[in-house]
UniProtKB/Swiss-Prot annotation:
It comes from the Eukaryota. Glycosylated. Disulfide bonds join 263-288, 265-281. This is Delta-sarcoglycan. Most strongly expressed in skeletal and cardiac muscle. Also detected in smooth muscle. Weak expression in brain and lung. It is a single-pass type II membrane protein. It comes from Homo sapiens (Human). GO terms for biological process: calcium ion homeostasis; calcium-mediated signaling; cardiac muscle cell contraction; cardiac muscle cell development; cardiac muscle tissue development; coronary vasculature morphogenesis; heart contraction; muscle organ development. It is linked to Muscular dystrophy, limb-girdle, autosomal recessive 6: An autosomal recessive degenerative myopathy initially affecting the proximal limb girdle musculature. Muscle from patients shows a complete loss of delta-sarcoglycan as well as of the others components of the sarcoglycan complex. Cardiomyopathy, dilated, 1L: A disorder characterized by ventricular dilation and impaired systolic function, resulting in congestive heart failure and arrhythmia. Patients are at risk of premature death. Glycans are attached at residues 60, 108, 284. Interacts with FLNC and DAG1. Cross-link to form 2 major subcomplexes: one consisting of SGCB, SGCD and SGCG and the other consisting of SGCB and SGCD. The association between SGCB and SGCG is particularly strong while SGCA is loosely associated with the other sarcoglycans.
């Protein structure tokens, strides 16, 4: 520091000496320390400025945003791949027009829908082994809004025109099912089977079994029973064959058993008539009326 000298004039008195000079300033080790701290401060300022410029360059700070992050009037815009290390809260997430939106994770991706009390209402978890959805109801719809699939605690609804099962073992229903139509693919067989229990088909207005281009077989191990409680059973075909009917043998003696013969009316109705020495169908023609 510049050295300042101040001259102090004492009052003129007899026997007084001349004027005295007093030095005011910083000298010695104090002066060197001051210069050192000033130099250190300048170095820190330069380093701080250089680090700031480097960070701005690396993070790609611009007027519009930082790096792949752009601030627009509608919100934030991210370009390229982005990684979030903490939970992300957003009202809407959409991709660039014409591009797909991808969610990638090393473990799983979880989407939670919360209420005002931060309680989870619905949850979707996609993991490496399964996709799980939690909620009161699950629906799948087309672009036009038509229901394709719906599931809740009460029922599962399939709204597609056709439900196809491609598994080799078919479909197993442990409970009853309701459907207006069961059919196989063209040139494929339709098989309804109950390996250990009975198979029951019921309908309030009738059950129709139709094979348009092939045969229809009903096979059982013990008894095959066709019963109509209030109506009749029709066998409408040009030929009706019963090839395995048992043949009776003539026994002139012994207990007489009741034997009947099968009679056919002109309209195709069948009835039984007590057998005699000759045909007795003409006697009981009142059944054909």
């Amino acid at each position: 520091m510049p050295q300042e000298q101040y001259t102090h004039h004492r009052s003129t008195m007899p026997g007084s000496v001349g004027p005295q000079v007093y030095k005011v300033g910083i000298y010695g080790w104090r002066k060197r320390c001051l210069y050192f701290f000033v130099l250190l401060l300048m170095i820190l300022i330069l380093v701080n400025l250089a680090m700031t410029i480097w960070i701005l360059k690396v993070m790609n700070f611009t007027i519009d945003g930082m790096g792949n992050l752009r601030i627009t009037e509608k919100g934030l815009k991210l370009e390229g791949d982005s990684e979030f290390l903490q939970p992300l809260y957003a009202k809407e997430i959409q991709s660039r027009p014409g591009n797909a939106l991808y969610f990638k994770s090393a473990r799983n991706v979880t989407v939670n829908i919360l209420n005002d009390q931060t309680k989870v209402l619905t949850q979707l978890i996609t993991g490496p082994k399964a996709v799980e959805a939690y909620g009161k109801k699950f629906e799948v719809k087309t672009v036009s809004g038509k229901l394709l699939f719906s599931a809740d605690n009460n029922e599962v609804v399939v709204g597609a025109e056709r439900l196809r099962v491609l598994g080799a073992e078919g479909t197993v229903f442990p409970k009853s099912i309701e459907t207006p139509n069961v059919r196989a693919d063209p040139f494929k067989e339709l098989r309804l089977e109950s390996p250990t229990r009975s198979l029951v088909m019921e309908a309030p207005k009738g059950v129709e079994i139709n094979a348009e281009a092939g045969n229809m077989e009903a096979t059982c191990r013990t008894e095959l029973r066709l019963e109509s409680k209030d109506g009749e059973i029709k066998l409408d075909a040009a030929k009706i064959r019963l090839p395995r009917l048992p043949h009776g043998s003539y026994t002139p003696t012994g207990t007489r058993q009741k034997v009947f013969e099968i009679c056919v009316c002109a309209n195709g109705r069948l009835f039984l008539s007590q057998a005699g020495a000759g045909s007795t169908c003409q006697i009981n023609t009142s059944v054909c009326l």
